[in-house]
Amino acid sequence: MSKDTISNMITSIRNGNLSKAKIVQIPATQTARSIAKILLDEGFIENFREVVISDKNYSLLTLTLKYQGRTREPYITTLRRISKPGLRSYSSYQDIPKVMGGMGIVILSTSQGIITDRQARQRRIGGEVLCYIW
């Protein structure tokens, strides 16, 4: 398992979507909670909850993935990690890219927490571009 929790989360969700899994479990971190809340608010996942394993002093986030139709096509088509530990990517609020002509979202890490591209433009703040989702 890698030390990059964001890449680990994105890879777990992508693998869950490819195998059409109902739930995905990832290690619970503050960053993972913030990203899961954004995914829930934007309608990309059905639900998430934190499961505390008391005997090991460890907690997991359980994400319930969302699918559409009888063919169970995932709502998340693509997840792409942008800023990596070896190559950080920052953007001012004017230069935040629009994903799929505004159909997708960009998740940014800012001084005001982890927020979407729309929230960053409204608040007029830039930050580190974490990932694209559509």
Swiss-Prot record:
Transmembrane segments: none annotated. GO terms for cellular component: chloroplast; ribonucleoprotein complex; ribosome. InterPro entries: Ribosomal_uS8, Ribosomal_uS8_CS, Ribosomal_uS8_sf. It is found in: Plastid, Chloroplast. The keyword Mitochondrion does not apply. Disulfide bonds: none annotated. One of the primary rRNA binding proteins, it binds directly to 16S rRNA central domain where it helps coordinate assembly of the platform of the 30S subunit. Belongs to the universal ribosomal protein uS8 family. Part of the 30S ribosomal subunit. This is Small ribosomal subunit protein uS8c.
